[in-house]
Every structure is written in C-alpha cells, then in structure tokens.
C-alpha cells in the first residue's frame, strides 16, 4: 500500500475513494458526544445550559446539512447562538474574523493569529496600557475567545487520544464491502482526519489491507486529492466517492465524479447496498443519472 499521492500509480481503470470518520469508521459520534461538545461546555462554563447546547452541537456536527463541518466553523456557529440566546462570549468578533479569513483552520493557524493580535496590541499601546495593565491581557487585545477556542481544541484532541481502542470500530459491513471491491478498483482512503489515527484505526479493524493508498489532511482537501487522483488517468465516470457528509458530496461534485452516500444512522444498510447493488451499477456504467440522483436525494433527506 502506498502512502504518498505523487508516487501512486493507477492499477485499475476504476477508482473508489472512501472517507474514514463517520463513513467507514464508527468514530464520529463518540468524538462529538464524548469530546467536542463536553469540552466546549467546560471551556466556557456553560453547564447551566448543558443539555440544550450538547444537543445543538450534535445537530450541527452529526445530524443536519452541516455534518462533517470543520471544528472551528462549528464552534463559530454555536458560539454565535450562545452569545445571542444564552450569555455573552467575550472576544467572539475576533474569533469570527479569524474563522472567516484564515486559509487554514488549524491549531497552528490560530496560535499564529493570537500572537499577531498580541503583537499588534502591544504596538498600538506604545509600551503602556493604563486601562488594561491590571486587567486580563486576553481581554485587552480581544483574543479571549480565540485563546479559549485553542484551549478547547487542544483538550478535544487529548480527549480523542484517550478514547479506548475498543471504542473505535468499523461499521458493520465495511470489511465485506471492501473485500468485494478489492481487485475490481483501486481503493483509496480520502479523509480529512489525522494520518496516523486513520492508519492505526484501519489496521486494527483489519481493513487497511484492502486499500491501495491513504490520503488524509496533510495531503490536502478531499476535492484536491480527488483532483490529483484524476490526473493518474481515470475517467470521471469511473471514479466513485463514498462518504457520509455534505463535504464528501461537494468534493465529488467539484470533480464531476460519482458519489455514493453512507447514511447516518443507516450505515450498515448503506454498506450492504454498496456491496450488493450500487457497485455493480458503477462497474457496469449504469450508476450515473437516475440511480445516482436517487441516492443523493436520500442523502439530503436524511440530513434534514
């Protein structure tokens, strides 16, 4: 199995790209239920409204059209709602501006933005800070929400790392589907997750062996990865993206390749359908058109 996009060589006329979290691996729900939401409540001291806010967090990230959204974009959405409906979020505007403007929604990018804001604040003060000298420096430079967002993200990562390996399982039917597809198409993981986490989880579940290549966040966006894979000589009609989130569909649509959805809360049935029905249509050239449109409509209805 290869590990680098530029070194990968096409071995089949067909290519099937498969997302990891929430698609092949049943790891998405537990990360949000146990890590993302609870860490947000703890970071901002929102225990008073915990039940409502955790439910809202899960709706945003798991069960509606924003499923699979970047963590910082999701945080921006819910903090706006909290600021409006529950309690003030100091420094929210600066965090919103960073989310909207940054080219990279990552911890490192946020760290750099906080440092830049601090430097700009010091320069503007000209060495003095009569109003904020005794106060909270985060408040004086407007970065309180940015700093808390970074702390939240770090704690989320720590929480995910602490999850036991037994809690990270492939969905039922994934292994059987991959086994049936192996040899008929090149199989590539296309995920926005961490490379080592994907490699470890897929290996533990005995499904890494079916894959020809693993592409993750360090290789670029899903759309970019598919775009680069197409340069290996695949026909658009012979490329299928299998995913569970609107971002997966968008990546397929941007490259004009086929899309098959793994429906949230119906994952086992979806993988069975891929193995028993959709794959044959894909390989026979009858997937596109009415059949694919019906799958996409079911996908959209399931996230409403």
List each model region and its residues.
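Generic enzyme active-site microenvironment
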Residues: 17-19, 242
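C-terminal cap/substrate-recognition subdomain and adjoining C-terminal extension
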Residues: 128, 166-186, 194-304
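Alpha-helical substrate-recognition element adjacent to the catalytic core
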Residues: 23-126, 132-199
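Short, basic/aromatic recognition patches
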Residues: 2-5
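Extreme N-terminal starter segment of soluble prokaryotic enzymes
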Residues: 13-15
